[in-house]
Each structure stands twice: as structure tokens, then as C-alpha cells.
From Swiss-Prot:
The large envelope protein exists in two topological conformations, one which is termed 'external' or Le-HBsAg and the other 'internal' or Li-HBsAg. In its external conformation the protein attaches the virus to cell receptors and thereby initiating infection. This interaction determines the species specificity and liver tropism. This attachment induces virion internalization predominantly through caveolin-mediated endocytosis. The large envelope protein also assures fusion between virion membrane and endosomal membrane. Belongs to the orthohepadnavirus major surface antigen family. It comes from the Viruses. InterPro entries: HBV_HBSAG. Glycans are attached at residue 320. GO terms for cellular component: membrane; viral envelope; virion membrane. Residues 96-106 have a biased composition (Polar residues). One of its GO terms (biological process) is fusion of virus membrane with host endosome membrane. This is Large envelope protein. Systematic vaccination of individuals at risk of exposure to the virus has been the main method of controlling the morbidity and mortality associated with hepatitis B. The first hepatitis B vaccine was manufactured by the purification and inactivation of HBsAg obtained from the plasma of chronic hepatitis B virus carriers. The vaccine is now produced by recombinant DNA techniques and expression of the S isoform in yeast cells. The pre-S region do not seem to induce strong enough antigenic response.
Amino acid sequence: MGGWSSKPRKGMGTNLSVPNPLGFFPDHQLDPAFGANSNNPDWDFNPIKDHWPQANQVGVGAFGPGFTPPHGGVLGWSPQAQGILATVPAMPPPASTNRQSGRQPTPISPPLRDSHPQAMQWNSTAFHQALQDPRVRGLYFPAGGSSSGTLNPVPTIASHISSISSRIGDPAPNMENITSGFLGPLLVLQAGFFLLTRILTIPQSLDSWWTSLNFLGGAPVCLGQNSQSPTSNHSPTSCPPICPGYRWMCLRRFIIFLFILLLCLIFLLVLLDYQGMLPVCPLIPGSTTTSTGPCKTCTTPAQGNSMFPSCCCTKPTDGNCTCIPIPSSWAFAKYLWEWASVRFSWLSLLVPFVQWFVGLSPTVWLSAIWMMWYWGPSLYNILSPFIPLLPIFFCLWVYI
């Protein structure tokens, strides 16, 4: 290593006519640090080195005539240094042991208590002790903050957490809940608008049916077109404001609207009576009224707990209080039937007929259905304007 050896050289590198004692040329490893002065003759591993006697031949070298670097050129002995472009094929990626292809699902994040225990235990004694460490305190106290011995980490940690929340934002909302909560009212609104448009056609349809009764066998024509304000031929259901029949058309539609409103109120009354929300006291036997006296309580306790009274306290002429239970369903209908039976005694004769009709065999019911089917077209023309009201009645019946 330190100097030149006096031992005779062996093998290659013994010709000192080419001075290169320190390995100046690339890949010409004559530096003593590589063992040039040792007894190892195989220290130079250049695979394409020139034969040593050819070093003294005259040739055009990189440093002028008469000098040729003996080891493949000034730039080295690699293929790129010799001007040969060798393309090395890229190594294929190692075969994956995972047989599943495509993007794999994101793994579930660990709980906060495992990934950030300091956020879960910020008010504990152990965490306060951990804040004594400058490295931990630097995470929660900003630069230039308080560095006194007394620590009050609660507001600082709260502000730190709030700053983290302001950076990362709120969690992503559940789009499924938002979609379901948005589509529900939208469908209800669409169904309501459709029913409204259909209901608005009811007065016009009933008006057409009403006016057709005056023109049996012919096309209905407005009678006011030949008056002092003549108009073109038009239907009596679409009179212009200048037509004398316009006021009659408005009157007919107003009566139709009142009829539809009365029909809805009757249906609502029947529904409430069926649900037992009309606690009407029945008539006292042998009387036409339900006189309530000074009796405040019933002598017979009520059956069950209900928000409506379950009995009526009456005081006949004998002075004794009498308790009459209120039916849980159809109380108002029974009251009307009792009242009508007292006023019209002949209605009591219909009771056996009604009971017989209810107890008919299925054959009779099928015959009645067949007759209704036979008369169906004419009934449909009469009842078709009221078809849009059926969904509304059904919804009220189900949800009330």
C-alpha cells in the first residue's frame, strides 16, 4: 500500500513504458491501493483488455499518435464506452401472490382509542404527566406559546382538535339517508300534484254529466249563443265570460264543489265513528233524548282506560243514576239509528231484512256482483269522476 515494491513483477503490468502509476485512466486499475504492487497477478479483471505487447505499437489514440491505452480506451471497457449501445431488457415485476385483481377495498381504520390514545385520555393524569416531555408538549402547544411549569392543556387541546377538524372537515354524510330523505317527500309531492290535477277535473266532468241531462239524444250546445251577445258554437261547460251561460256554469260548478266537500266530510265522519273517536251517548230507553243529570260519576266502573268517556251518567225521573256504556265503535251511527227508529217506527221493520241480506249465501252475492258488472258501463260513466277521490279516502282510512 505505502510505496513501490522491489520485488520483481509478474504477469501483466510489468511494462513500465506506459506511466500510469495511480490509475489515471478509467478502469485501468494500476493504483497501488488495488494491489498493483502485490504478488497477486490477477488483480485486473477487465475482460476485453488488450494484450500487453500491443501497447508499444504505433496507433492513433485518444492522446495523439503513438499512444493507445492498453485497456480498451480512455472511457473504459464497458459496451457503452466502446460505442456499443446495449439495451438491457427490463426485469418483469415479481409475480403477485394475491390472486385477487382490481382495486382492493380500503382497510378499516383502527379505533381512535388505538390510533390516537392521547385524544381519548387528554384529561387523565397519565396524559398530564406525558405533557412534561418537551416532544409531547410541542404537539399541543404552538410555537411561542406558554412554556411555564403550570400546564393547562384543556383549552389548548380543544383548540388543537378544533384546528384538526377545520383542516380535515366534517365526516362524509351518508348519501343513502340523504337520498331516501329527499326522494320520499318528492314522491309524495308528485302524487299529490297528480291527484290535485285529477280532482280539478271532477267539477268539469260532473258539469258535463249535468248538462247532458238537458240534451238527451243530442249534443249539448250553449243556449246563450243566440242572445244579444252572440258567440261561436261552444259547449255549455266551457262558456266564455261574455256568454250569458257563464254565470250558470259557475253556479253549477259551485254546487258540485259543495257536493264534493260534503262527500269528503261524510267519509271523514264515518271514519272517525269507526275508530271510536265520536263518544256519543246513546239514547235512554223509552226516551228521545240523552238527558244528563247531576250525576258526576258512573255507578258502574268504565271498561278499560281510554281517552274518551266509556259511559254516560243519566238521571231519570226516579232519581237514581243510570250508567249507559258508550260503544267503542259506531257510537254515532247507533245513536242516529236509535233516534230514527224512535221518530220513524217503520224503520224497525227493516231490521230483519237487513239481517237476512247480510246472511245471504255466496251465490246471491255473486249474482249481485254479476248484475253490477252488467250495469257497469253506465255506472262507470257516473262514478268515473269520483275515482281520483278513492286514493285519498284509502289513505285516510289507513292512517287515521
